[in-house]
Protein backbone atom coordinates (compact mmCIF):
# COMPACT_ATOMS: atom_id res chain seq x y z
CA UNK A 1 0.00 0.00 0.00
CA UNK A 2 1.54 3.32 -1.09
CA UNK A 3 1.46 6.50 1.01
CA UNK A 4 -1.64 7.96 -0.67
CA UNK A 5 -3.60 4.73 -0.30
CA UNK A 6 -2.56 4.51 3.35
CA UNK A 7 -3.79 8.07 4.01
CA UNK A 8 -7.14 7.34 2.35
CA UNK A 9 -7.50 4.12 4.32
CA UNK A 10 -6.70 5.94 7.55
CA UNK A 11 -9.35 8.56 6.77
CA UNK A 12 -11.92 5.81 6.16
CA UNK A 13 -11.06 4.15 9.47
CA UNK A 14 -11.25 7.51 11.27
CA UNK A 15 -14.67 8.21 9.73
CA UNK A 16 -15.98 4.81 10.83
CA UNK A 17 -14.50 5.24 14.29
CA UNK A 18 -16.04 8.71 14.67
CA UNK A 19 -19.47 7.29 13.83
CA UNK A 20 -19.06 4.72 16.60
CA UNK A 21 -17.61 6.99 19.28
CA UNK A 22 -18.53 10.47 18.01
CA UNK A 23 -21.16 11.08 20.69
CA UNK A 24 -18.62 10.75 23.52
CA UNK A 25 -17.01 13.80 25.09
CA UNK A 26 -13.32 13.88 24.28
CA UNK A 27 -10.67 13.54 26.97
CA UNK A 28 -13.11 11.85 29.36
CA UNK A 29 -12.49 8.52 31.07
CA UNK A 30 -14.99 6.60 28.96
CA UNK A 31 -13.64 8.21 25.76
CA UNK A 32 -10.13 7.01 26.52
CA UNK A 33 -11.05 3.50 27.75
CA UNK A 34 -12.81 1.20 25.31
CA UNK A 35 -14.04 -2.37 25.60
CA UNK A 36 -14.84 -4.30 22.42
CA UNK A 37 -16.90 -7.39 23.18
CA UNK A 38 -15.95 -8.89 19.83
CA UNK A 39 -17.29 -12.43 19.70
CA UNK A 40 -19.22 -14.80 17.45
CA UNK A 41 -22.99 -14.82 18.06
CA UNK A 42 -24.61 -16.99 20.75
CA UNK A 43 -21.70 -17.43 23.13
CA UNK A 44 -23.12 -15.47 26.08
CA UNK A 45 -21.83 -12.08 24.96
CA UNK A 46 -25.10 -10.17 25.48
CA UNK A 47 -25.07 -10.93 29.21
CA UNK A 48 -21.42 -9.94 29.32
CA UNK A 49 -22.11 -6.60 27.62
CA UNK A 50 -25.04 -5.73 29.89
CA UNK A 51 -23.01 -6.73 32.95
CA UNK A 52 -20.08 -4.48 32.04
CA UNK A 53 -22.40 -1.59 31.14
CA UNK A 54 -24.27 -1.84 34.43
CA UNK A 55 -21.02 -2.10 36.38
CA UNK A 56 -18.66 0.23 34.54
CA UNK A 57 -20.37 2.57 32.04
CA UNK A 58 -18.91 5.45 34.04
CA UNK A 59 -15.39 4.23 33.20
CA UNK A 60 -15.56 2.45 29.83
CA UNK A 61 -17.22 2.79 26.46
CA UNK A 62 -18.54 -0.68 25.60
CA UNK A 63 -19.04 -1.87 22.03
CA UNK A 64 -20.72 -5.20 21.19
CA UNK A 65 -19.98 -6.52 17.71
CA UNK A 66 -19.79 -9.86 15.91
CA UNK A 67 -18.48 -9.17 12.42
CA UNK A 68 -17.89 -6.66 9.61
CA UNK A 69 -21.53 -6.92 8.50
CA UNK A 70 -22.54 -5.37 11.83
CA UNK A 71 -19.77 -2.77 11.49
CA UNK A 72 -21.08 -1.70 8.09
CA UNK A 73 -24.63 -1.59 9.48
CA UNK A 74 -23.53 0.72 12.32
CA UNK A 75 -21.28 3.02 10.27
CA UNK A 76 -22.47 2.73 6.67
CA UNK A 77 -18.83 2.27 5.67
CA UNK A 78 -17.62 -0.84 3.83
CA UNK A 79 -14.19 -2.42 3.52
CA UNK A 80 -13.12 -1.55 7.07
CA UNK A 81 -12.37 -4.39 9.47
CA UNK A 82 -13.03 -4.46 13.20
CA UNK A 83 -9.36 -5.22 13.76
CA UNK A 84 -8.51 -1.98 11.95
CA UNK A 85 -10.87 -0.04 14.25
CA UNK A 86 -9.24 -1.69 17.28
CA UNK A 87 -5.73 -0.90 16.03
CA UNK A 88 -6.73 2.69 15.21
CA UNK A 89 -7.96 3.34 18.74
CA UNK A 90 -4.69 1.98 20.07
CA UNK A 91 -2.82 4.20 17.60
CA UNK A 92 -4.57 7.37 18.89
CA UNK A 93 -3.63 6.48 22.46
CA UNK A 94 -6.72 4.85 23.93
CA UNK A 95 -6.69 1.94 26.35
CA UNK A 96 -8.39 -0.93 24.54
CA UNK A 97 -9.78 -4.23 25.83
CA UNK A 98 -11.03 -6.89 23.42
CA UNK A 99 -13.07 -9.76 24.87
CA UNK A 100 -14.06 -13.07 23.28
CA UNK A 101 -15.98 -16.03 24.72
CA UNK A 102 -15.76 -19.75 23.97
CA UNK A 103 -18.87 -21.93 24.04
CA UNK A 104 -19.02 -25.69 23.49
CA UNK A 105 -19.82 -26.57 19.84
CA UNK A 106 -23.14 -28.43 20.05
CA UNK A 107 -24.76 -25.93 22.42
CA UNK A 108 -23.51 -23.01 20.34
CA UNK A 109 -24.93 -24.58 17.16
CA UNK A 110 -28.29 -25.14 18.86
CA UNK A 111 -28.44 -21.56 20.11
CA UNK A 112 -27.42 -20.09 16.76
CA UNK A 113 -30.00 -22.21 14.94
CA UNK A 114 -32.83 -21.15 17.26
CA UNK A 115 -31.77 -17.52 17.06
CA UNK A 116 -32.60 -17.56 13.33
CA UNK A 117 -35.31 -20.22 13.36
CA UNK A 118 -38.13 -17.75 12.66
CA UNK A 119 -36.78 -15.26 10.10
CA UNK A 120 -34.35 -17.61 8.44
CA UNK A 121 -34.69 -21.40 8.78
CA UNK A 122 -38.51 -21.67 8.62
CA UNK A 123 -39.54 -18.14 7.61
CA UNK A 124 -42.52 -18.26 9.94
CA UNK A 125 -43.60 -16.50 13.12
CA UNK A 126 -42.25 -17.67 16.46
CA UNK A 127 -45.83 -18.26 17.62
CA UNK A 128 -46.40 -20.75 14.79
CA UNK A 129 -42.98 -22.38 15.06
CA UNK A 130 -43.54 -22.94 18.77
CA UNK A 131 -46.20 -25.47 17.73
CA UNK A 132 -43.81 -27.45 15.51
CA UNK A 133 -42.81 -30.94 16.54
CA UNK A 134 -39.30 -31.56 17.86
CA UNK A 135 -38.90 -34.10 15.05
CA UNK A 136 -39.49 -31.47 12.37
CA UNK A 137 -37.06 -29.02 13.95
CA UNK A 138 -34.46 -31.76 14.50
CA UNK A 139 -34.51 -32.81 10.86
CA UNK A 140 -33.82 -29.25 9.71
CA UNK A 141 -31.17 -28.70 12.38
CA UNK A 142 -29.33 -31.88 11.37
CA UNK A 143 -29.30 -30.80 7.74
CA UNK A 144 -27.37 -27.63 8.56
CA UNK A 145 -25.46 -28.83 11.65
CA UNK A 146 -21.93 -28.96 10.14
CA UNK A 147 -22.27 -25.45 8.73
CA UNK A 148 -23.39 -23.67 11.91
CA UNK A 149 -21.29 -21.77 14.47
CA UNK A 150 -17.87 -22.22 12.92
CA UNK A 151 -14.59 -20.64 13.95
CA UNK A 152 -13.20 -18.79 16.94
CA UNK A 153 -12.40 -15.08 17.06
CA UNK A 154 -9.48 -15.30 19.50
CA UNK A 155 -7.69 -17.97 17.45
CA UNK A 156 -8.84 -17.16 13.90
CA UNK A 157 -9.61 -13.43 13.79
CA UNK A 158 -7.61 -11.37 16.27
CA UNK A 159 -4.23 -11.96 14.59
CA UNK A 160 -2.38 -12.46 17.87
CA UNK A 161 0.03 -15.16 19.11
CA UNK A 162 -1.82 -18.18 20.50
CA UNK A 163 -0.45 -20.10 23.51
CA UNK A 164 -0.18 -23.88 23.49
CA UNK A 165 -3.31 -24.29 25.58
CA UNK A 166 -5.97 -22.46 27.56
CA UNK A 167 -5.11 -21.60 31.17
CA UNK A 168 -7.41 -23.97 33.05
CA UNK A 169 -6.24 -22.65 36.41
CA UNK A 170 -6.87 -18.93 35.87
CA UNK A 171 -9.87 -19.67 33.61
CA UNK A 172 -8.94 -16.98 31.08
CA UNK A 173 -6.32 -15.90 28.55
CA UNK A 174 -4.84 -12.40 28.49
CA UNK A 175 -2.51 -11.16 25.77
CA UNK A 176 -1.19 -7.60 25.89
CA UNK A 177 -0.01 -5.84 22.76
CA UNK A 178 0.99 -2.24 23.51
CA UNK A 179 -2.21 -0.70 24.94
CA UNK A 180 -4.52 -3.45 23.63
CA UNK A 181 -5.56 -6.22 26.02
CA UNK A 182 -7.02 -9.34 24.38
CA UNK A 183 -9.10 -11.43 26.80
CA UNK A 184 -10.55 -14.89 26.27
CA UNK A 185 -13.23 -16.30 28.56
CA UNK A 186 -15.28 -19.51 28.53
CA UNK A 187 -19.04 -19.58 28.96
CA UNK A 188 -18.73 -22.50 31.37
CA UNK A 189 -16.84 -20.18 33.74
CA UNK A 190 -19.44 -17.39 33.66
CA UNK A 191 -19.83 -17.63 37.45
CA UNK A 192 -16.19 -16.45 37.66
CA UNK A 193 -16.39 -13.69 35.04
CA UNK A 194 -17.08 -11.01 37.63
CA UNK A 195 -13.98 -11.88 39.60
CA UNK A 196 -11.80 -12.23 36.47
CA UNK A 197 -12.90 -8.97 34.85
CA UNK A 198 -12.84 -7.02 38.11
CA UNK A 199 -9.15 -7.83 38.37
CA UNK A 200 -8.30 -7.10 34.73
CA UNK A 201 -10.39 -3.92 34.42
CA UNK A 202 -9.56 -2.70 37.94
CA UNK A 203 -13.21 -2.01 38.73
CA UNK A 204 -15.98 -4.11 40.27
CA UNK A 205 -17.92 -6.10 37.68
CA UNK A 206 -21.17 -7.83 38.64
CA UNK A 207 -22.52 -10.42 36.18
CA UNK A 208 -26.24 -10.42 35.36
CA UNK A 209 -28.20 -12.83 33.16
CA UNK A 210 -29.57 -11.36 29.96
CA UNK A 211 -31.33 -12.39 26.73
CA UNK A 212 -31.79 -16.13 27.19
CA UNK A 213 -33.57 -17.94 24.35
CA UNK A 214 -35.54 -19.89 26.98
CA UNK A 215 -37.35 -16.62 27.79
CA UNK A 216 -38.40 -15.91 24.19
CA UNK A 217 -41.69 -16.96 22.56
CA UNK A 218 -40.03 -20.13 21.25
CA UNK A 219 -38.56 -20.84 24.69
CA UNK A 220 -40.85 -23.82 25.25
CA UNK A 221 -39.83 -25.49 22.00
CA UNK A 222 -36.17 -24.67 22.61
CA UNK A 223 -36.19 -26.28 26.05
CA UNK A 224 -37.97 -29.36 24.71
CA UNK A 225 -35.53 -29.61 21.80
CA UNK A 226 -32.49 -29.44 24.09
CA UNK A 227 -33.90 -32.15 26.33
CA UNK A 228 -34.89 -34.53 23.54
CA UNK A 229 -32.18 -34.00 20.91
CA UNK A 230 -30.07 -37.02 20.00
CA UNK A 231 -26.72 -36.42 18.29
CA UNK A 232 -26.14 -38.36 15.04
CA UNK A 233 -23.09 -40.60 15.44
CA UNK A 234 -21.28 -39.08 12.43
CA UNK A 235 -21.58 -35.64 14.05
CA UNK A 236 -20.09 -37.03 17.24
CA UNK A 237 -16.90 -37.68 15.27
CA UNK A 238 -16.86 -34.04 14.14
CA UNK A 239 -17.20 -32.84 17.73
CA UNK A 240 -14.59 -35.27 19.04
CA UNK A 241 -12.05 -33.83 16.60
CA UNK A 242 -13.03 -30.18 17.11
CA UNK A 243 -9.76 -28.25 17.48
CA UNK A 244 -11.33 -25.48 19.56
CA UNK A 245 -12.80 -27.92 22.07
CA UNK A 246 -9.38 -29.56 22.35
CA UNK A 247 -7.72 -26.18 22.92
CA UNK A 248 -10.10 -24.61 25.44
CA UNK A 249 -10.99 -27.68 27.49
CA UNK A 250 -8.71 -29.84 29.62
CA UNK A 251 -8.55 -33.59 28.95
CA UNK A 252 -10.88 -34.20 31.86
CA UNK A 253 -13.37 -31.57 30.67
CA UNK A 254 -13.30 -33.03 27.14
CA UNK A 255 -13.97 -36.54 28.46
CA UNK A 256 -16.87 -35.27 30.58
CA UNK A 257 -18.35 -33.39 27.62
CA UNK A 258 -18.02 -36.29 25.19
CA UNK A 259 -19.40 -38.72 27.76
CA UNK A 260 -22.47 -36.52 28.12
CA UNK A 261 -23.16 -36.80 24.40
CA UNK A 262 -22.15 -40.45 24.11
CA UNK A 263 -25.27 -41.19 26.12
CA UNK A 264 -27.37 -39.25 23.58
CA UNK A 265 -26.27 -40.74 20.26
CA UNK A 266 -28.47 -41.86 17.38
CA UNK A 267 -28.13 -43.09 13.79
CA UNK A 268 -25.97 -41.10 11.34
CA UNK A 269 -27.65 -38.60 9.02
CA UNK A 270 -26.87 -36.83 5.78
CA UNK A 271 -26.32 -33.09 5.98
CA UNK A 272 -26.39 -30.52 3.23
CA UNK A 273 -23.18 -30.41 1.23
CA UNK A 274 -21.43 -27.06 1.08
CA UNK A 275 -23.01 -26.13 -2.31
CA UNK A 276 -26.42 -27.29 -1.05
CA UNK A 277 -26.03 -25.21 2.11
CA UNK A 278 -25.08 -22.11 0.09
CA UNK A 279 -28.20 -22.64 -2.02
CA UNK A 280 -30.23 -23.03 1.19
CA UNK A 281 -28.82 -19.77 2.57
CA UNK A 282 -29.52 -17.80 -0.60
CA UNK A 283 -33.03 -19.23 -0.90
CA UNK A 284 -33.85 -18.30 2.70
CA UNK A 285 -32.55 -14.77 2.24
CA UNK A 286 -34.56 -14.29 -0.97
CA UNK A 287 -37.78 -15.49 0.67
CA UNK A 288 -37.26 -13.87 4.06
CA UNK A 289 -40.28 -11.86 5.23
CA UNK A 290 -39.62 -11.70 8.99
CA UNK A 291 -37.20 -9.11 10.32
CA UNK A 292 -34.18 -10.59 12.10
CA UNK A 293 -32.88 -7.29 13.46
CA UNK A 294 -32.98 -7.49 17.24
CA UNK A 295 -33.76 -4.34 19.18
CA UNK A 296 -33.81 -3.65 22.88
CA UNK A 297 -32.48 -7.11 23.76
CA UNK A 298 -29.99 -5.86 26.35
CA UNK A 299 -30.79 -5.22 29.98
CA UNK A 300 -28.63 -2.11 29.51
CA UNK A 301 -28.53 -0.34 26.14
CA UNK A 302 -25.69 1.92 27.25
CA UNK A 303 -27.41 5.33 27.39
CA UNK A 304 -25.36 7.74 29.53
CA UNK A 305 -28.05 10.33 30.34
CA UNK A 306 -28.58 11.28 33.98
CA UNK A 307 -31.78 9.25 34.29
CA UNK A 308 -30.32 6.06 32.79
CA UNK A 309 -27.14 6.45 34.84
CA UNK A 310 -29.21 6.74 38.02
CA UNK A 311 -31.25 3.64 37.15
CA UNK A 312 -28.01 1.81 36.26
CA UNK A 313 -26.65 2.56 39.73
CA UNK A 314 -29.83 1.17 41.33
CA UNK A 315 -29.65 -2.03 39.25
CA UNK A 316 -25.94 -2.43 40.05
CA UNK A 317 -26.67 -2.28 43.78
CA UNK A 318 -29.48 -4.83 43.38
CA UNK A 319 -27.20 -7.16 41.39
CA UNK A 320 -24.54 -6.89 44.12
CA UNK A 321 -27.11 -8.16 46.62
CA UNK A 322 -27.88 -11.14 44.40
CA UNK A 323 -31.30 -9.88 43.34
CA UNK A 324 -32.41 -11.29 39.97
CA UNK A 325 -32.61 -8.41 37.50
CA UNK A 326 -35.79 -8.33 35.41
CA UNK A 327 -36.02 -4.61 34.65
CA UNK A 328 -34.21 -2.95 31.74
CA UNK A 329 -32.50 0.38 31.19
CA UNK A 330 -34.40 1.79 28.22
CA UNK A 331 -34.03 5.55 27.75
CA UNK A 332 -37.64 6.24 26.72
CA UNK A 333 -39.00 4.09 29.54
CA UNK A 334 -36.66 5.77 32.03
CA UNK A 335 -37.79 9.25 30.89
CA UNK A 336 -41.46 8.23 31.17
CA UNK A 337 -40.78 6.80 34.62
CA UNK A 338 -39.15 10.07 35.73
CA UNK A 339 -42.11 12.08 34.37
CA UNK A 340 -44.58 9.75 36.13
CA UNK A 341 -42.69 10.06 39.41
CA UNK A 342 -42.62 13.86 39.11
CA UNK A 343 -46.35 13.92 38.36
CA UNK A 344 -47.00 11.70 41.39
CA UNK A 345 -44.90 14.03 43.55
CA UNK A 346 -46.72 17.10 42.22
CA UNK A 347 -50.10 15.44 42.82
CA UNK A 348 -49.01 14.52 46.34
CA UNK A 349 -48.00 18.13 47.07
CA UNK A 350 -51.23 19.47 45.54
CA UNK A 351 -53.28 17.01 47.60
CA UNK A 352 -51.47 18.12 50.77
CA UNK A 353 -52.15 21.77 49.97
CA UNK A 354 -55.80 21.02 49.21
CA UNK A 355 -56.12 19.04 52.44
CA UNK A 356 -54.49 21.88 54.37
CA UNK A 357 -56.88 24.41 52.84
CA UNK A 358 -59.78 22.06 53.50
CA UNK A 359 -58.75 21.80 57.15
CA UNK A 360 -58.42 25.59 57.36
CA UNK A 361 -61.88 26.05 55.90
CA UNK A 362 -63.26 23.41 58.23
CA UNK A 363 -61.68 25.17 61.22
CA UNK A 364 -62.98 28.51 59.99
CA UNK A 365 -66.49 27.10 59.60
CA UNK A 366 -66.25 25.55 63.06
CA UNK A 367 -65.22 28.89 64.58
CA UNK A 368 -68.06 30.67 62.79
CA UNK A 369 -70.55 28.02 63.91
CA UNK A 370 -69.31 28.18 67.52
CA UNK A 371 -69.44 31.97 67.48
CA UNK A 372 -72.95 31.92 66.00
CA UNK A 373 -74.11 29.42 68.62
CA UNK A 374 -72.63 31.57 71.38
CA UNK A 375 -74.43 34.67 70.08
CA UNK A 376 -77.66 32.71 69.85
CA UNK A 377 -77.17 31.48 73.40
CA UNK A 378 -76.51 34.97 74.70
CA UNK A 379 -79.54 36.33 72.89
CA UNK A 380 -81.73 33.58 74.33
CA UNK A 381 -80.42 34.33 77.82
CA UNK A 382 -81.14 38.01 77.35
CA UNK A 383 -84.58 37.26 75.98
CA UNK A 384 -85.41 34.98 78.92
CA UNK A 385 -84.13 37.64 81.30
CA UNK A 386 -86.37 40.25 79.70
CA UNK A 387 -89.35 38.04 80.17
Where are these regions (language model features)?
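Membrane-interface amphipathic segments in extracytoplasmic regions
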Residues: 1-386
Amino acid sequence: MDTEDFKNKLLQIKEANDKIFGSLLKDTEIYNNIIFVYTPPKVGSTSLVSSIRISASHKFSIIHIHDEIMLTFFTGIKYISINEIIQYNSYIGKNVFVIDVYRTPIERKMSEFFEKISPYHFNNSEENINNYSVKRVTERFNKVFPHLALGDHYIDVYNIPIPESFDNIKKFLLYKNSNINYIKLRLKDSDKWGEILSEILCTEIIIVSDYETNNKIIGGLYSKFKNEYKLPSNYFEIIKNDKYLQFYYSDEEINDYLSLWTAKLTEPVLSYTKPEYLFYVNLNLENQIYNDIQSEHYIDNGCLCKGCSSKRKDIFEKAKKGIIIKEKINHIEVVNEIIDNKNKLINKIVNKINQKNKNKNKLKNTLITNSSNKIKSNLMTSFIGLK
